[in-house]
């Protein structure tokens, strides 16, 4: 998905979550996190 950052708040679209598998602030927008 698109890049997102938890530091800037969740900049993902409706129904998308900012997934950060590495536990970092940087992640990607996905419909579900696993």
From Swiss-Prot:
GO terms for cellular component: extracellular region. It is found in: Secreted. The keyword Secreted applies. Expressed by the venom duct. The keyword Secreted applies. Keywords: Disulfide bond, Hydroxylation, Knottin, Neurotoxin, Secreted, Toxin. The modification 4-hydroxyproline is found at residues 14, 21. This is Conotoxin Cl6d. Disulfide bonds join 4-19, 12-29, 18-33. The presence of a 'disulfide through disulfide knot' structurally defines this protein as a knottin. GO terms for molecular function: toxin activity.
């Amino acid at each position: 998905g698109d890049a997102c950052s938890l530091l800037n708040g969740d900049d993902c679209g409706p129904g998308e979550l900012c997934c950060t598998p590495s536990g970092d602030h940087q992640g990607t927008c996905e419909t579900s996190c696993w």
